[in-house]
Amino acid sequence: MGVWYAIGSIIFGLLVGVSVYLISRKIFHSNSQIIIEQAKAKAKAIEYEAQNILQKHHMQIKEEQMRLKQEYEQECATLHKNYESRLAKLDKEESNRYQQLNNQKQEVEKEKQEIAELKVRLLRSQGEQDKLKQEYQHIKKEMLDVLSKYAQMTREEATNILLSHLEEELIEEKAFLIRRYEKQAYDEAKKQANFVLAQATTRYAGDFATERLVNVINLPNDELKGRIIGKEGRNIKTLETISGVDVIVDDTPGSIILSSFNLYRRAIATKTIEKLVEDGRIQPSRIEEVYERVKDEMDEQMRQDGENIVLDMELGYMHPELKFLLGKMRYRASFGQNALGHSIEVANLAAIIAGELGGDEKLARRAGILHDIGKALTQELGGSHVDLGVEVCTCYKEHPVVINAIKAHHGYEEIQSIECAAVCAADTLSAARPGARREALENFLKRMQDIERIAMDKIGVKQAYAINAGREVRVIARADLVSDGQSVILAREIAKEIESTLQYPGEIKVSVIRETRAVEFAR
């Protein structure tokens, strides 16, 4: 009995345990389903909210696109309207100028007709004078007979008396006629000259740009400023030393400034920095390598520019060295006016003027493009650009009219041809235009050039750069000719000569740099 009771208890316990397990498992499964359903609901809610946000952003983007499109269309319409307005204004001005020229031409034709009528009247007057002369001879004969008969004079004495009175009257009449015809000729020549100049200025419209003293280089990011400066300023010192240009790194975001009065140096330095920034390797040895390569490229570019100018202007054969000097003039300025732009303008105006006056247009154009060729050599050789231009054109056997134009446009020689006169007139037109030249800038540039010339004239000087707006001159001395002790003496001599020969505000710092380099290769 006890055994069965124990067995029953065990079975009952097992049944209870199994029941509890099944019930627990069912409860756990129910809770899991609830959690899963809740997670699904949350996921759907999140997905729905994300779709709402995405749709909202899509709507905002579309609205922004529509707004930008409307602004772009409005701006295009405004620009088109301004363009149409300016075009109409230019057409009106051109029509007015054309009308003025027609009026001037009609006036000239009218004056020519009046002159022709005057010539006819003069011929008639001459016929009447001949008739009066015959009558005079007849009366003279009768008077001589009377005088010789009644005044007891010889025929020769009476003739001398009459001729002396007649000579005085004729001299006065001759002087009056000379003054009158001189005035008529002067007025006619002045009107004709004004007509020719009006024709030239209306038929040629050249570009003009005032040269600045700085170049601005845009950088991709401000981090490059530190790399351009380099460790302890080595990179920027190398740049300034080899190029002779001030490199200004200030707080202006994304840009640096190059300052120099010499357009050629500034252009080389600008291209050098642009290539270094593009390459990414900025260090002293790399700077020197890129600088030399850019310098060679610039020389080749100047030769190509000269070739293109000669071809475009149809000047025929010209010596390669003269073409190179023409290309070099792109990097020269006079009174703030670009030398090459000025020469091209003079050449085109001179050709038009020479054509109006019956001269050789091609020869006038050639003389005009070469009239300031000496300015391409003044910074290296010094002296007058007229003397240098005459010397180089004589050396390369240019036409005598070209050499005469170089001398005559500054009054060194009399004008000897129509083409030379056309060049002188065109030079005056180009230079005398309001705003074309700036005297103060030219005086500053001349002082900078004089500072460099004084330093370059000293023995042992390899190169000299006037920097910091003329407040410092940096002199590169040859190590094989100048010792450390002589460097001090050289700096003092340059400073003393600058003090005695130039006028300048403040003071000028003279820095003499002497560097010795030894290069050897390990093989």
Swiss-Prot record:
User: From what superkingdom does this record's organism come?
Assistant: Bacteria
Q: Where is the KH domain?
A: 213-279
Q: Name one GO biological process term.
A: mRNA catabolic process
Record bears the keyword Transmembrane:
yes
Instruction: Output the Gene Ontology cellular-component terms.
Output: plasma membrane
Enzyme class at the top of the EC tree: hydrolase
Q: Which residues cross the membrane?
A: 3-23
User: Where is this chain's protein located in or outside the cell?
Assistant: Cell membrane
Which EC number(s) are documented for this chain? 3.1.-.-
Q: Which family does it belong to?
A: Belongs to the RNase Y family.
**Principal subcellular localisation of the protein:** membrane
Membrane topology is: Single-pass membrane protein
Q: Tell me the organism's taxonomic lineage.
A: Bacteria, Pseudomonadati, Campylobacterota, Epsilonproteobacteria, Campylobacterales
- Which keywords does UniProt give here? Cell membrane, Endonuclease, Hydrolase, Membrane, Nuclease, RNA-binding, Transmembrane, Transmembrane helix
Domain (HD): give its ranges.
339-432
GO molecular function, a single term: RNA endonuclease activity
Q: What is this protein called?
A: Ribonuclease Y
Give a short account of what the protein does: Endoribonuclease that initiates mRNA decay.
